[in-house]
Amino acid sequence: MSAIPIVKLKTSQIEAAGTILARAFSEDSFFSYVLPDPDTRFPALEYYSRSYVYASCLAGGVYGTLDPVTGIAVWGVPGSPVTLEHRNRSGLDRLPESFGTGAYQRYKHMVDFFESLIGRDVPTPHWYLSILGVDPDHQGKGLGGALLQPALAQADEDGLPCYLETLEEKNLGFYVRHGFEVLVDDR
């Protein structure tokens, strides 16, 4: 297979990226827990994905495939966090209204748990792989691995570790193949 071109996501690609992530995560354990109603999950997930990708683009940590966008990697970049201004500009500040009270409380509970691991089990500074999603029609073709490469290469150059969390046991083999190790198994 030839090399898959991966680029910094452009703001013109955010809408497509949000739809792809919503498709990729519509059956994910995290979002099925947060948004248990399958009839409302996709639109809420699409809003969240677009807003989160936009905020992360403003912070400089989103990579994607060239047009058409078929995969996205959202990274937390050391020294370039998503700020309150990014959240406000992107619409993330309206997430409680988009999700509804119960779903937003479940979301915050999960995020707070994951954030509690940083510093305790996760060294800082680090690169944080927040979201890696590939359109279901394009999975299994090497896009996920290609999407990881720019940030992994930069982290290696900077001598910094990378961190992610997954609730999907089926994803562990993929991440291990790309150099990640399990630090915490909190099943």
Label for each model-derived stretch:
Residues 38-61:
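Active-site rim helix/loop that mediates acceptor-substrate recognition in acyltransferases
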Residues 145, 157-159, 168-185:
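Conserved active-site alpha-helix within GNAT-family acetyltransferase domains
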